C-alpha cells in the first residue's frame, strides 16, 4: 500500500541519516577523557533485599580500568537498583563500596531529563560546560557538540519545553556525555533512543577509553 511504501521509504532515510551521523562523529574518536586512576570501584560483601526479594547476596567485585560489562535480567530483577547502589544513589543493606577519587560517573537513567523547560537548548548545555576537550589539545564548542547530536543551529535556540520526547531523550544523553565522564552507566538506552542517536552513541562508545556498564 501507499502507506506501507511511505513507511519503508522513511526507514531507509533514517538508516541513511544514521550512517551519515556515524561518519560525522569521527571527531569524537579524539576525545580527551577525564583522567582515571588505578582504583575504580571495589565492591565487598554487599547485600540488598526488598522484603523477601534478594537483589544482592554477598556480592564482591573489583572494576578494572577500561572494563566493559553488560547486566542482563528480567524486568524487576533489580538491575537498576544494582547500578544505583554502585553509584551510591541508593544504599546497600550492608557491605562496602569504595569508589576511586578520580571516578566521574555519567549516568543515563530511565528517569529522563530533569531540567527547567523554559531554558533554551544551547543555554542548558553551556551551563554544563562551554567546551568538550579533545586529545589534540583542541575542543568542541557546545554548539558543535549539539550539531553532532543532530541539533541544528535553529533547534539549539528552541526552548526545551518545545522539544519532542525523542529530542529530550537525545538531549539527556548528550548532557551526560558532555560532562566528560570516565565511567559510563547506561540503563537500557536502546529503549528510548532513535536510530540516528544510537548511531552517534555507538560511535562514541566504540572508542570510549573509560569503564562502561550497560543494562
Protein language model features and the residues they cover:
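Interdomain "pre-motor" coupling segment immediately N-terminal to P-loop NTPase/helicase cores
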Residues: 3-15
Amino acid at each position: 500500500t501507499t502507506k506501507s511504501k511511505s513507511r519503508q521509504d522513511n526507514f531507509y532515510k533514517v538508516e541513511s541519516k544514521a550512517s551519515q551521523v556515524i561518519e560525522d562523529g569521527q571527531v569524537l574518536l579524539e576525545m580527551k577523557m577525564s583522567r582515571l586512576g588505578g582504583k575504580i570501584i571495589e565492591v565487598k560483601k554487599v547485600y540488598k533485599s526488598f522484603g523477601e526479594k534478594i537483589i544482592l547476596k554477598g556480592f564482591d567485585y573489583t572494576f578494572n580500568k577500561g572494563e566493559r560489562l553488560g547486566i542482563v535480567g528480567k524486568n524487576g530483577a533489580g538491575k537498576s537498583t544494582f547500578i544505583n547502589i554502585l553509584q551510591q544513589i541508593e544504599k546497600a543493606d550492608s557491605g562496602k563500596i569504595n569508589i576511586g577519587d578520580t571516578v566521574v560517573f555519567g549516568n543515563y537513567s530511565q528517569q529522563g531529563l530533569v531540567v527547567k523547560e523554559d531554558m533554551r537548548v544551547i543555554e542548558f548545555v553551556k551551563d554544563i560546560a562551554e567546551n568538550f576537550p579533545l586529545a589534540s589539545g583542541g575542543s568542541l564548542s557546545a554548539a558543535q557538540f549539539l550539531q553532532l547530536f543532530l541539533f541544528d543551529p535553529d533547534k539549539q535556540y528552541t526552548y526545551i519545553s518545545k522539544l519532542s520526547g525523542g529530542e529530550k531523550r537525545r538531549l539527556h544523553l548528550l548532557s551526560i556525555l558532555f560532562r566528560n565522564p570516565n565511567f559510563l552507566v547506561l540503563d537500557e538506552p536502546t529503549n528510548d533512543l532513535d536510530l540516528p542517536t544510537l548511531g552517534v552513541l555507538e560511535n562514541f562508545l566504540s572508542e570510549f577509553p573509560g569503564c562502561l556498564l550497560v543494562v
